[in-house]
Amino acid sequence: EVERKHPLGGSRPGRCPTVPPGTFGHCACLCTGDASEPKGQKCCSN
């Protein structure tokens, strides 16, 4: 896991999952920061 800060702000404790080596993650920004997510969830972008 890697701690990442979303470019649009918001930072909750926790870590975003890593993308396994040799693979590509689905790159979609569907949130605007941790504050836009339900309580206890993080906004992660790979």
Curated annotation (Swiss-Prot):
GO biological process: antibacterial humoral response; innate immune response
GO cellular component, one term: extracellular space
SUPFAM superfamilies associated with the record: Elafin-like
Keyword annotations of the record: Antibiotic, Antimicrobial, Protease inhibitor
Source taxon at top rank: Eukaryota
Domain (WAP) ranges: 12-46
InterPro entries: Elafin-like_sf (IPR036645)
Single annotated GO MF: serine-type endopeptidase inhibitor activity
Function: Has antibiotic activity against several equine uterine pathogens; S.zooepidemicus, E.coli and P.aeruginosa. Highly efficient against S.zoopedemicus. Not active against K.pneumoniae. Selectively inactivates microbial serine proteases (subtilisin A and proteinase K) without inhibiting mammalian serine proteases (human neutrophil elastase, human cathepsin G and bovine pancreatic trypsin).
Protein name: Antimicrobial peptide eNAP-2
Organism: Equus caballus
Record lineage: Eukaryota, Metazoa, Chordata, Craniata, Vertebrata
